[in-house]
């Protein structure tokens, strides 16, 4: 029973790290990356649809994204969705393809993005700690029901703390890498 709780906690902590990494990937750096546009929703035939379902997003060069729209009638909607996103991008239409030059980030904008990334990292750490708290409370319930001993609980707490520290360290490493990436000019 305790092993199942331990495995579940480890799995959930891993998912927290992955979610944090995905959130940080959406923060714009100086380089073009297709995941920048993942959060954009396009009004396609009256339905909000993710951009990657109505167009193919690629990298033309280090500062330019290209968006190839599958349905020519949706070009205007895709262009409007990209312009109205909070990414500060200005697409240029070239037939069925939109070219999106990424403007260089100002020092002030970089610092704002670093604040956002740090907040995401803190959110990830909090989520990992919540998983630890939940797992420990589950084992303490087992102890109250006399299904495990006090020593088992202590050992479990130590193990879960080690997992927690390891996963928080991963989040910190991801944060450090993202900060370095953001500060590159």
From Swiss-Prot:
Major subcellular location class: cytoplasm
GO molecular function per UniProt: ribosomal large subunit binding
InterPro entries for this protein: Ribosome_recyc_fac, Ribosome_recyc_fac_dom, RRF_sf
Pfam families: RRF
Gene3D superfamilies for the chain: 3.30.1360.40, Ribosome-recycling factor
GO BP annotations listed: cytoplasmic translational termination
Subcellular location: Cytoplasm
GO cellular component: cytosol
Keyword Transmembrane helix (UniProt): no
Alphabetic keyword roster: Cytoplasm, Protein biosynthesis
HAMAP family: RRF (MF_00040)
Role of this protein: Responsible for the release of ribosomes from messenger RNA at the termination of protein biosynthesis. May increase the efficiency of translation by recycling ribosomes from one round of translation to another.
Stored NCBIfam families: frr (TIGR00496)
Family (UniProt): Belongs to the RRF family.
Protein name per UniProt: Ribosome-recycling factor
């Amino acid at each position: 029973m305790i092993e199942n709780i331990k495995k579940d906690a480890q799995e959930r902590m891993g998912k927290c790290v992955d979610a944090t990494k995905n959130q940080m990937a959406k923060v714009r750096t100086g380089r073009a990356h297709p995941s920048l546009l993942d959060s954009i929703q396009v009004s396609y035939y009256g339905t909000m649809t993710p951009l990657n379902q109505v167009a193919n997003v690629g990298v033309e060069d280090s500062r330019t994204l290209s968006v190839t729209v599958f349905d020519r009638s949706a070009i205007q909607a895709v262009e409007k969705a990209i312009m109205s996103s909070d990414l500060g991008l200005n697409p240029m239409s070239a037939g069925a393809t939109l070219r999106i030059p990424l403007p260089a980030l100002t020092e002030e904008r970089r610092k704002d993005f670093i604040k956002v990334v740090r907040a995401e990292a803190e959110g990830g750490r909090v989520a990992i700690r919540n998983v630890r708290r939940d797992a420990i409370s589950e084992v303490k319930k087992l102890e109250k029901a006399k299904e495990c001993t006090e020593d088992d609980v202590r050992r479990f707490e130590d193990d879960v703390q080690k997992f927690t520290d390891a996963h928080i360290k991963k989040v910190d490493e991801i944060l450090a890498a993202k900060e370095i990436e953001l500060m590159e000019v």
